[in-house]
Swiss-Prot record:
The active site is at residue 817. GO terms for cellular component: membrane; plant-type vacuole; plasma membrane; plasmodesma. It comes from Arabidopsis thaliana (Mouse-ear cress). Residues 660-980 are cytoplasmic. This is Receptor protein kinase CLAVATA1. It holds the Pfam family LRRNT_2. The chain crosses the membrane at residues 639-659. Coiled coil: none annotated. It comes from the Eukaryota.
């Protein structure tokens, strides 16, 4: 008997020794088969996964870990990146404890064979973006030990899997950033082990999930961002006593903030921004003793900031901007010892800022702009020398800027526009090492600017409309990167320092409406970066520098209303970039030069110069004391009269001959073509005219024809042929294009290179965009090639171009014809806003202007524009919202939805037709079917912005600056999860 048992044991030992290597080899086979379906960017990925005769060689493969029996227990190939699909053979790695395939580019559905991975504790397939289909809940049933399930940022759809409630050990669950629909299953409230719940941006809807309050171990909960709940913040959440992060931003919450949240003693982050919350901020929130970040911005909250906030001793960030809050900002805010960011712009706060604000020494950013605040600026804002951004614009602050701010070396941006501030500006403000912009326009500052100034990064100074006096200090020349200098409407006197025009990057200078004397420095002739110069309404004397024509890129020169003498330099005629010239009301004399750029300017450019001789005058005025070429007697001598009569008869004969020849020459050029350049061009007008051939036409429209022209220097240009001035018709946008594109420069606005013109025809010359218009690509046969990454980038870049027009141009510029066909794409698919034929300057940014007729394109026109003809920048915002919907849906704004229905109405109709509407459900219903592998979170984010832009009420639409901010700043919790 004993011998039989011994033989049996030996047999089992032999079988074990025989088959153990075999099992290890099987895992190697599985890995090598998996490798064949995981393709790297340059062919096969996982280069060290190579077959070997060694039974445990696979255990040294990158991303692979084994147990003592050489069985694979961990497979982590995240951030490789890999393409391809997840092979069903993954289910053969039955000893896997950790499967992490995050941050790759896997596509397709999850294989059901994964249900064999019964030992799995970690399953992380996040940030692939292209995993699709319904999430197969059945694979989870046997994963009884699963602790982490992360599917964030993929394309899963359908309902959330109800099987989650069976995972009794699950601690981390993220289904965020997918295309799910419907409600959160109530059974999710039974996953008692759960510590992290991420359902943000998942397209969920239904009632606000109060049942999640049963998750007593929960520490982080992200359930906002493009989910759409009915109801408000569940009061029951006050029972989640271990909760550290509650993020319900942007999920259509209504009602008031529940006071029960004050029970969350461990909560350090509360994000409820971008909702429709009403009522007051509960004073009970001061019970959140661990709170560090509070964001309640962009809601409809009213009332005052609670005094009890003094108890929030750990808070670092308070964002309350864009609400309806009022009253005084309490002293308690200044008492908060760790406060770093305080943003309350666009509210109705009154009275003074807390005098103790910043005294804690930690303040980094303060933005209280667009309120009704008054009083003095607190002196301790930068006590800790950490303050970086100080924005106090559009209030009623008075008194001086505290001297202490002049010592704040951490400051990077100072914007204190439109207040009642007075006194002298601290000298130190102009010597701060990190400041990039100083904007003090529209106040009552007085005194002289400091004699000593310096700063390596300062690029913008705006001191317009104050009471500054004294001389302009030469020390301004110590700002090597200065680009913009606005000193207009002050009381400066003395000369313009030559050092200013020696700055290597100066592009715009305005010293108009001062008491400046002396001459224009000769150094202006060497300032090649200048684009705009306004020295008007001063007492500048002397002559115009002869070398002014060396400033090749100068587009605007206004030196009117001075005491300039001498003749106009003929070299100005060679300044092909110069589109605006104003020399009026000086003491210039001699003849206005003929030809060149002088053909562009009209008589108003030279008005008010008594002794200046305009080209059409036969005789020129002379100064008192000067003698004419002939005395009075000679003028009326008999011989003179005879000669005059003969000349008159001869002239009549010549005129009659000319009239008879007119019809013969009607089809010939009425004037020689003239090229006017806005930058240095290496071709001539003849080169442009050679390209006006039928085979070069690339587009036709109501304003004319567009040709592609190949210049001798191998540069392609786009030539837009307009109906000209001589036909009696309108100029079809010629003036608007010249006045706008001729004076602005921006990366995302198409460059106007110049124009060629004669009496009958205008030819506008643009940089050529080889990829055509967004409209052509989006709605043509190539639309499918515009994947989401490109579409999103185009949206951001076009928004930046429009933002520049609305917020960085003075006066602001309205485009008035924003549409996909007017967004052009260069060889890198970079977007450029184009076609300014309907553009309009709006002098007062807060006003609107009434137009005589509707401008714009059907399907893009804002509703208020159609029936009031009043236009402001929000009209452009509406049109841009339509473009965003085009990018999402891939459909034209009109013509595809039935009579009288445009894309905006179609989207709203679609929402009404969905049984359980949510942002995700709407996006799924309208998204361009040609898009593949698009990230749900990003598309919904853009969709939300689009719907804000196309609000019926203009006041409800965001500004383009806000649009750019939203497009370029994904929700905070989403951004953090992406970096997982």
């Amino acid at each position: 008997m004993a011998m039989r048992l011994l033989k049996t044991h030996l047999l089992f030992l032999h079988l074990y020794l025989f088959f153990s290597p075999c099992f290890a080899y099987t895992d190697m086979e599985v890995l090598l088969n998996l490798k064949s379906s995981m393709i790297g960017p340059k062919g096969h990925g996982l280069h060290d996964w190579i077959h070997s005769s060694s039974p445990d060689a696979h255990c040294s493969f990158s991303g692979v870990s084994c147990d003592d029996d050489a069985r694979v227990i961990s497979l982590n190939v995240s951030f490789t990146p890999l393409f391809g699909t997840i092979s069903p053979e993954i289910g053969m790695l039955t000893h896997l404890v950790n499967l992490t395939l995050a941050a790759n580019n896997f596509t397709g559905e999850l294989p059901l064979e994964m249900k064999s991975l019964t030992s799995l504790k970690v399953l992380n397939i996040s940030n692939n973006g292209n995993l699709t289909g319904t999430f197969p809940g059945e694979i989870l049933k046997a994963m009884v030990d699963l602790e982490v399930l992360d599917t964030y940022n993929n394309n899963f759809n359908g309902k959330l899997p109800p099987e989650m409630s069976e995972l009794k050990k699950l601690k981390y669950l993220s289904f965020g950033g997918n295309f799910f629909s419907g409600e959160i299953p109530e059974s999710y409230g039974d996953i008692q082990s759960l510590e992290y719940l991420g359902l943000n941006g998942a397209g969920l809807s239904g009632k606000s999930p109060a049942f999640l309050s049963r998750l007593k171990n929960l520490r982080e909960m992200y359930i906002g961002y493009y989910n759409s709940y009915t109801g408000g913040v569940p009061p029951e959440f006050g029972g989640l006593t271990k909760l550290e992060i509650l993020d319900m931003a942007s999920c259509t919450l209504t009602g008031e903030i529940p006071t029960s949240l004050s029970n969350l003693k461990h909560l350090h982050t509360l994000f409820l921004h971008i909702n429709n919350l009403t009522g007051h901020i509960p004073p009970e929130l001061s019970g959140l003793v661990s709170l560090k970040s509070l964001d309640l911005s962009i809601n409809q909250l009213t009332g005052e900031i609670p005094q009890s906030f003094i108890n929030l001793g750990n808070i670092t960030l308070i964002n309350l901007f864009r609400n309806n809050l009022y009253g005084q900002i309490p002293e308690a805010i200044g008492e908060l010892p760790k406060l770093e960011v305080f943003e309350v712009w666009e509210n109705n706060f009154t009275l003074q800022l807390p005098a103790n604000l910043g005294r804690n020494g930690n303040l980094i950013k303060l933005d209280v702009s667009d309120n009704h605040l008054t009083g003095l600026i607190p002196k301790d804002l930068c006590r800790g020398e950490k303050l970086e951004m100080l924005i106090l614009s559009n209030n009623f602050f008075f008194g001086p800027i505290p001297e202490e701010l002049g010592k704040c070396k951490s400051l990077t941006k100072i914007r204190i526009v439109k207040n009642l501030l007075n006194g002298t500006v601290p000298a130190g403000l102009f010597n701060l090492p990190l400041v990039t912009i100083i904007e003090l326009t529209d106040n009552f500052f007085s005194g002289e600017l400091p004699v000593t100034m310096s700063g390596d990064v300062l690029d913008q100074i705006y001191l317009s409309n104050n009471w500054f006096s004294g001389e302009i200090p030469p020390a301004i020349g110590n700002f090597p990167n200065l680009q913009t200098l606005f000193l207009d409407r002050n009381r400066f006197r003395g000369n313009i320092p030559r050092e200013i025009f020696e700055l290597k990057h100066l592009s715009r200078i305005n010293t108009s409406a001062n008491n400046i004397t002396g001459g224009i420095p000769d150094s202006i002739s060497r300032c090649s970066t200048l684009i705009s110069v306004d020295l008007s309404r001063n007492r500048i004397n002397g002559e115009i520098p002869k070398g002014i024509n060396n400033v090749k890129n100068l587009g605007t020169l206004n030196i009117s209303g001075n005491q300039l003498t001498g003749s106009i330099p003929t070299g100005i005629g060679n300044m092909t970039s110069l589109t605006t010239l104003d020399l009026s009301f000086n003491d210039l004399s001699g003849r206005v030069p003929l030809g060149g750029q002088f053909l562009v300017f009209n008589e108003t450019s030279f008005a008010g110069n008594t002794y200046l001789c305009l080209p059409h005058r036969v005789s020129c005025p002379t100064r008192p004391g000067q003698t004419s070429d002939h005395n009075h007697t000679a003028l009326f001598s008999p011989s003179r009269i005879v000669i005059t009569v003969i000349a008159a008869i001869t002239g009549l004969i010549l005129i009659s001959v000319a009239i008879r020849q007119m019809n013969k020459k009607k089809n010939q050029k009425s004037l020689a073509w003239k090229l006017t350049a806005f930058q240095k061009l290496d071709f001539k007008s003849e080169d442009v005219l050679e390209c006006l051939k039928e085979e070069n036409i690339i587009g036709k429209g109501g304003a004319g024809i567009v040709y592609r022209g190949s210049m001798p220097n191998n540069v392609d240009v786009a030539i837009k042929r307009l109906v000209g001035r001589g036909t009696g018709r309108s100029d079809h946008g010629f003036t608007a294009e010249i006045q706008t594109l001729g004076r602005i420069r921006h990366r995302h606005i198409v460059r106007l290179l110049g124009y060629v013109a004669n009496k009958d025809t205008n030819l506008l010359l643009y940089e050529y965009m080889p990829n055509g218009s967004l409209g052509e690509l989006l709605h043509g046969s190539k639309g499918g090639h515009l994947q989401w990454e490109t579409r999103h980038r185009v949206a951001v870049e076009a928004a930046k171009g429009l933002c520049y027009l609305h917020h960085d141009c003075s006066p602001l510029i309205l485009h008035r014809d924003v549409k996909s066909n007017n967004i052009l794409l260069d060889s890198d698919f970079e977007a450029h806003v184009a076609d300014f034929g309907l553009a309009k300057f709006l002098v007062d940014g807060a006003a609107s202007e009434c137009m005589s007729s509707i401008a714009g394109s059907y399907g893009y026109i804002a509703p208020e524009y159609a029936y009031t003809l009043k236009v402001d920048e929000k009209s452009d915002v509406y049109s841009f919202g339509v473009v965003l919907l085009e990018l999402i849906a891939g459909k034209k704004p009109v013509g595809e939805f039935g009579e009288g229905v445009d894309i905006v109405r179609w989207v709203r109709n679609t929402e009404e037709e969905i049984t359980q509407p949510s942002d995700a459900a709407i996006v799924v219903a309208i998204v361009d079917p040609r898009l593949t592998g698009y990230p749900l979170t990003s598309v919904i984010h853009v969709f939300k912005i689009a719907m804000m832009c196309v609000e019926e009420e203009a006041a409800a639409r965001p500004t383009m600056r806000e649009v750019v901010h939203m497009l370029t700043n994904p929700p905070k919790s989403v951004a953090n999860l992406i970096a997982f």
